[in-house]
């Protein structure tokens, strides 16, 4: 399966990120230019998250053993994070606020149910995942 994400920076630069055959690539899209794609990371799952903040492009991806955070400012750097993203993950969102880091992801737990989880870093340590439905209960309401 190929996944594609478009990202526009505050400098009006447009980037295409995509997954293909175990790797994540990015390509700058520019008028009248054919820029070759660059492989960012290999041996990863097809679930990844991309965002732009303070002049940097960030990419969160998952290998068999770790989550990996990549950062771009004219050059890609990566850092292994001390947690894994479940193989059953179907969607992923990563965010920062002041000095906190958290990510939200969905996991299909059986044929009919998909659940949202949140995981965050507190005091330089990753907390255990929390089911969002356990934080924000809607009860048995059908409305």
Give each language-model segment a name.
Residues 1-143:
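Extracellular, repeat-based ectodomains that mediate carbohydrate processing or recognition
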């Amino acid at each position: 399966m190929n996944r594609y994400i478009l990202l526009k920076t505050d400098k009006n630069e447009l980037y295409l990120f995509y997954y293909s055959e175990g790797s994540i690539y990015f390509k700058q899209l520019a008028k009248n230019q054919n820029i070759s794609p660059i492989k960012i990371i290999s041996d990863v799952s097809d679930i990844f998250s991309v965002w732009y903040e303070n002049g940097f492009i960030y990419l969160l991806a998952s290998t068999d053993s770790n989550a990996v955070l990549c950062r771009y400012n004219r050059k890609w750097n990566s850092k292994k994070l001390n947690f894994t993203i479940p193989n059953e993950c179907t969607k992923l969102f990563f965010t920062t606020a002041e000095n906190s880091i958290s990510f939200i992801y969905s996991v299909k737990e059986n044929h009919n149910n998909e659940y949202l989880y949140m995981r965050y870093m507190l005091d330089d340590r990753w907390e255990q995942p929390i089911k969002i439905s356990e934080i924000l209960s809607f009860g048995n309401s059908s409305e």
